[in-house]
Amino acid sequence: MSISQIDDYRTQYTLETFSFLPELTADEIYDQIVYIINQGWSPALEHEEPAKASDHYWGMWKLPMFGTRDPNEVLAEIDACRQAYPNHLIRLVGYDNYTQCQGHNFVVYRPRGM
């Protein structure tokens, strides 16, 4: 990766772990889902309008996917959330039940123009 591929940190939203990198590919998102599941964390989806993303709590899509071991189930929920909220940012969270905090989170969908 060259320095020209990294966005200017002063002119973009930094909403998640990978904000300064190019958007993740579908395979990279899949790998991150596998990582969350392998850590024993519960995947959960959050969504919010881009204009409110940095100063509001994000709404949760359904409930966290407690006990999910299949990354394809998580991908299906991401797609369902995207279809229901096509103009919202969608973030995947890996919730750690033991420490009761987020172990990982990143944006999996940005609407056009973001």
Curated annotation (Swiss-Prot):
Recorded effect of pH on activity:
Optimum pH is 8.0.
Q: Where in the cell is it found?
A: Carboxysome
Q: Which Pfam family, any one, appears in the UniProt record? A: RuBisCO_small
Per its record, what triggers expression of this gene product? Induced by growth in low levels of dissolved inorganic carbon (at protein level).
Mind telling me which GO cellular component terms the entry cites?
A: carboxysome
Alphabetized InterPro entries for the sequence: RuBisCO_ssu, RuBisCO_ssu_dom, RuBisCO_ssu_sf
Keyword terms, alphabetized: Bacterial microcompartment, Calvin cycle, Carbon dioxide fixation, Carboxysome
Which SUPFAM superfamilies does this chain map to? RuBisCO, small subunit
The record's section on CDD domains has: RuBisCO_small (cd03527)
For this chain, one GO molecular function annotation is: ribulose-bisphosphate carboxylase activity
Q: GO terms for biological process?
A: reductive pentose-phosphate cycle
The annotated subunit structure for this chain is: Heterohexadecamer of 8 large and 8 small subunits. Forms a CsoS2-CsoS1-RuBisCO complex.
Q: Describe its function.
A: RuBisCO catalyzes two reactions: the carboxylation of D-ribulose 1,5-bisphosphate, the primary event in carbon dioxide fixation, as well as the oxidative fragmentation of the pentose substrate. Both reactions occur simultaneously and in competition at the same active site. Although the small subunit is not catalytic it is essential for maximal activity. Replacing the endogenous type I ccbLS genes in H.neapolitanus with this carboxysomally targeted enzyme reconstitutes RuBisCO with about 25% of normal activity; the active enzyme is targeted to carboxysomes.
Q: What else is known?
A: Encoded in a cso-type operon.
Q: Which family does it belong to?
A: Belongs to the RuBisCO small chain family.
| Protein name per Swiss-Prot or TrEMBL | Ribulose bisphosphate carboxylase small subunit 2
Organism, by scientific name, is Hydrogenovibrio crunogenus (strain DSM 25203 / XCL-2) (Thiomicrospira crunogena)
The encoding gene is cbbS2
